[in-house]
Amino acid sequence: MKETTSPIRHSSSARTRSPELLLPAGDPEKLRVALAFGADAVYAGVPKYSLRTREIGFRRESLEEAVTYTHRQGKKIYLAMNIYAHNLKVDGFLNELDRVAAWEPDGLIMSDPGLIALALKRHPHIPIHLSTQANTTNWTTVHFWRDLGVRRIILSRELHLNEIAEIHQKVPDIELEAFVHGAICIAYSGRCLISNYLNHRDANQGTCTNSCRWEYKLAWEKGSILEVEKSQSPYETTIPIPDGFTLSEPKHHHEKMPIFEDTFGTYLMNSRDLCAIELLPDLVKAGVVSFKVEGRTKSAWYAAMTARSYRRAIDDMSAGQPFNPDHLRDLLTLSSRTYTTGFYTRNPRQYGENFEDGYSAGFRYRVTGILKSYDESSSMGTFEVKNRMKTESELELITPRETIPFTLRVMENLKGESLETAHGGAENVRILLPQDPGDYAFLRQKTE
């Protein structure tokens, strides 16, 4: 991992109880993949009433089917209804709540105190999990929610391991869930970190300096100031930013904040992604019973690799085995902004950000295909092509249990005609595989 960190404390090799591995389900395919690759449970958003409304890959009918499918696999599904509702949405929310409750999900992820109280009154048999959006950071708040009837707290990402342990010690009779992997938000609504970042005054503690309202100057390292001409529309001005530019605020002109820009945007606060796979024993020791992976908008490949890596790490930990670095290496092949352990071991400060790799650091491998079916008689697998594949190239077949290297010898279209090359987005192809991949598998190829 690229971050310079203090040494990570590993627990002893004594056998540890196995926590829940909770994966995101952005759509039906990702749900099935997550469960196949090792998730104990998944979470999905209810259309219109969760915080990923625009990216939800479920409709009401498919979400009900997802609940049924998950239960048939002997696993759990939690449904997010964690909006903070305005008056206009309350009646609709309650109607949808009644429909969802009839499906008997294993829990509802909620934030709004009033809606939580109504849900507990209308459907007391369905566990309520308090969303991380509720910003739970201390044991007194956990105590309050437990007394109200909430069964699980999804902890704020800003907590240190020691703080989690104290919460568990003082309120032991409630489940604690913690994020272990995925993107990290800098701010949510009024819960802003800009003042803390720029002026060391925490808005969440009542000391906001309104840093977002300050006047800022854009400066080049040679000392010149760029004057941006105002236009009729604030969206019409775009200036490419080369290396060496900084932002400063007149009252703190000596403090220069570097700006980096690539083809995907300009980054003032670009958090690294969370990866706490090496801290799982410490999180269990602190009282966490569910490890949550962020990423409902990520790909099925992301769901597969995070599920498999954390499943293996949890199983090793539960069996008393030391941490296997191969689990982290697999995560490093995913697209990310490089990794940080967040606040679990310290305040990350500048090490929590990554400007050099603003968009994707997972460049060593690319996904070339997703398995759609397998014919045992011919040993041929039908794949959706995601990226260019060529015969005689070296590929890896990724299954829930194995990584199988092989040389691509035979590839054909669905008519049985031989192919030398297949391109992403084209029609599906059939490939001769070294073994039966099972129901779910991917192909990947090294890019170096």
Language-model region placement:
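Surface-exposed amphipathic alpha-helical tracts and adjacent flexible/coil segments at the periphery
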Residues: 2-10, 14-36, 41-48, 66-67, ...
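Alpha-helix capping/helix-boundary segments
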Residues: 114-115
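Gly/Gly-Pro- and Ser/Thr-rich, intrinsically disordered tail segments characteristic of DNA damage-repair
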Residues: 91, 125, 130-137
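Alpha-helix capping and helix-loop boundary segments enriched in small/acidic/polar residues
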Residues: 54, 132-136, 155, 301
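Glycine-rich, positively charged N-terminal anion/phosphate-binding segment
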Residues: 53-69
